[in-house]
Amino acid sequence: MGQQQSGFGGRGNDRGAGDGEKKEKKKYEAPIPSRIGKKKKGSKGPDAASKLPAVTPHARCRLKLLKSERIKDYLLMEQEFIQNQERLKPQEERQEEERAKVDELRGTPMAVGSLEEIIDDQHAIVSTNVGSEHYVNIMSFVDKEQLEPGCSVLLNHKNHAVIGVLSDDTDPMVSVMKLEKAPQETYADVGGLDQQIQEIKEAVELPLTHPEYYEEMGIRPPKGVILYGCPGTGKTLLAKAVANQTSATFLRIVGSELIQKYLGDGPKMVRELFRVAEENAPSIVFIDEIDAVGTKRYDSNSGGEREIQRTMLELLNQLDGFDSRGDVKVLMATNRIESLDPALIRPGRIDRKIEFPLPDEKTKRRIFQIHTSRMTLGKEVNLEEFITAKDELSGADIKAMCTEAGLLALRERRMRVTMEDFQKSKENVLYRKKEGAPEELYL
């Protein structure tokens, strides 16, 4: 009995365990239907256009990512290698290579133009000497801080692109006008002309060295001085003596140099001349033979005459633009003051007019002493005969007489000049002065 009961009890336990296993089993799930042979249903509704498709990673995308990372590593290694090589390379070699690259971009030859207007950081409008204007590019290696309207720039000869800036935009012709070395002539080399020397000292030299004298007197120093008189009376010589005596910058120009070929170059040179004078103040501007550009104005159909008149108008403008106490003085010289325009020599522009007449007996004696001081003269030489003569000899004629007498003595292998040499030299000088050069010189 006990065995049977125990047997029945064992079966009951097995049945309970089976029921637990059935309860633990998962529910039946239907298999995913196959899409093969079935059309994809089109998504309907407004939200379908904004939904992104589901993207699942693939092995091919992973390979592309690994390849891109490897390429990036190689590029970083190459960049590091180049940086190391640049660091090891001497600085001078790097600079030479950079200059060579810039020169290659610039090209040769380079044209010079004027910057008219800056459009933006990369474009500008430039003009050339011919007068045409161009809309051009500005190269990246050009210093943008130095660019300003009106400055001189370097242009490529093909596309006129701006490839550089001229730091010193001074006209080369104006730079040549500036005397780097003072002339050797002094006031002692000027025979006579004591009154003229005193007047030019008061008008030019003293305002530059002692301007306080004029302030105490309550007057304004003259702006400009004009020297006029017959040829050979010492106008240019006195201007050289002024340049030697003062420590001011001396700018010398001949009036014919202001007449240029292209339209507008003459007035531009006048502006450059006075701009350089103001930058190097105190300075003296000496314009010799001013009658080349300062003649009286009249109606003319010639383009050259109109350009000369424009140059003179720019000169008048520059004379009016000076400060009354400025450290720039204007010195002019001419042989024909009657042909000058009245607007040029009126008070306010040219305040003092100094006349240089033909030398008198006292001045002739002084000039002869200056030019014969180093010559060996014979005992029979009497210079008073030439001094008291009524011949209209200028200072340049007397100098030519002394030089010609010395040449005649050298022709005869003599180191002493005789009275006969002076007489022959006087005849030659007077003949060339009155009759001109002999025709035999041109045969």
Curated annotation (Swiss-Prot):
Q: What does the UniProt record say this protein does?
A: The 26S proteasome is involved in the ATP-dependent degradation of ubiquitinated proteins. The regulatory (or ATPase) complex confers ATP dependency and substrate specificity to the 26S complex. May play a role in the degradation of microtubule severing protein mei-1.
> Which intervals of the chain are annotated as region Disordered?
1-53
Q: What is this protein called?
A: Probable 26S proteasome regulatory subunit 4
Binding-site residues, ATP: G229, C230, P231, G232, T233, G234, K235, T236
Give the Basic and acidic residues compositional bias ranges: 12-29
Q: Name one Pfam family in it.
A: AAA_lid_3
Q: Which domain of life is it from?
A: Eukaryota
Q: Which GO terms describe its cellular component?
A: cytoplasm; nucleus; proteasome regulatory particle, base subcomplex
Q: Where in the cell is it found?
A: Cytoplasm; Nucleus
Entry similarity comment: Belongs to the AAA ATPase family.
Species per Swiss-Prot/TrEMBL record: Caenorhabditis elegans
What phenotype is described for loss of this gene? RNAi-mediated knockdown at the L1 larval stage, causes 20 percent increase in mei-1 protein levels.
Concerning Gene3D superfamilies, the annotation shows: 1.10.8.60, Nucleic acid-binding proteins, P-loop containing nucleotide triphosphate hydrolases
Residues in coiled coil: none
GO MF annotation: an example: ATP binding
Q: Which GO terms describe its biological process?
A: negative regulation of gene expression; proteasome-mediated ubiquitin-dependent protein catabolic process
- UniProt entry tagged with the keyword Nucleus: yes
Q: Which UniProt keywords apply?
A: ATP-binding, Cytoplasm, Nucleotide-binding, Nucleus, Proteasome
